[in-house]
Structure formats: structure tokens, C-alpha cells
Amino acid sequence: MASHIGKLPIAIPAGVEVKIEGQNFSAKGAKGSDSYVVPEGITAAVEGNEIVLTAADDLRPTRAKHGLARSIMAGMVKGVHDGYSKTLEIVGTGYRAVAKGQGIEFFLGYSHTITVNPPEGITLKVTDANHVVVEGTDKQVVGQVAANIRKLRAPEPYKGKGIKYSDERILRKAGKAGK
């Protein structure tokens, strides 16, 4: 019984260059390049315009790594071809973001401003004072940077003020009951 996810082939889109040397996998595309070390017990091969992964045995840990490796490699191929992005929305009176060099300066109701500088391979854009876009080729890093920015002022449940993902719904609570 093989991994259901692992046995699916990964389509290589036009414009993406894939290299497999032993356990090292690298992908290069229009948006950038990325590399990954394939776990032991998993072999990757390019067949035509697809990447096929095979597991050495059928043990549970190997099956888990098989699916994991396939998902990570598929994400890398998509990342170097299309890229990943997350949009954050800033809600609240006086809360805003301003581009400052490579990074962004946030005014979030604290006594000080907060400057966020992106790691390598990530770009931060301020579309307007209340919207920030995090873009990059690595899905995990894009999500982590977006989560770190959201954490600066997480949305509160009473008025919904704070930084939220653009597709996130904030669960609202009723305020205290009056007399």
C-alpha cells in the first residue's frame, strides 16, 4: 500500500528547469529557484515532463516521507513558476502601513512604530495604507512572514481591530451588557 499523495506525478510546467542529482532536487523558474534534499528511502526521477517519486519500501515512516516529499516538491515547482502570495488587511482607526526601503513600517496604536524587514527571497508591498502583500517562491516562508506580521497586532474579537488575512473572518463577541 503506497502513499496516495506520493504516487501522484508532479507536472513540470513550461519555463521550469528541474535537476535531480542523487538526493538533491532543485527547481528554477521565472520567479526564482529553490532546492530540497529528498529524504532517504525516496527516489525522484524525471520522466518526460513529470517528476515521479518512488519509495524503497512500504513501511509507515517511508510512506509518510513519500507523501511529504511529493507535496514539498510540487509546492517548489509551483512556487518558482507562479510564486505564492498572502494579503493582509489592517483594520482600525489610525492603523496603517508605510513602505520603508525593502521593509514596511507599521503604525498600530503602540507608542512606537514597528519596522518589518523581509527575509531573503520575500518581497513586501503596500498596496494602500491598509493592505500589505507578502510574496515569494517558498510557500512556508511566505506563510511564516505573514503570520509574524499578523502577530504584531492580532485582531481582537470585539471591534475586529488589528491585522488579519484578507480572507479571514473574525469571530465577533458581544460587548458587555448594559443595565
From Swiss-Prot:
One GO term describing the cellular component: cytosolic large ribosomal subunit
Record carries keyword Kinase: no
Pfam families noted in UniProt: Ribosomal_L6 (PF00347)
GO molecular function, one term: rRNA binding
UniProt entry keywords in alphabetical sequence: Ribonucleoprotein, Ribosomal protein, RNA-binding, rRNA-binding
SUPFAM superfamilies xrefs: Ribosomal protein L6 (SSF56053)
GO biological process per UniProt: cytoplasmic translation
Family: Belongs to the universal ribosomal protein uL6 family.
Function statement: This protein binds to the 23S rRNA, and is important in its secondary structure. It is located near the subunit interface in the base of the L7/L12 stalk, and near the tRNA binding site of the peptidyltransferase center.
NCBIfam families reported for this sequence: L6_bact
Oligomeric form and interacting partners: Part of the 50S ribosomal subunit.
Protein name (database record): Large ribosomal subunit protein uL6
Organism, as annotated: Bifidobacterium longum (strain NCC 2705)
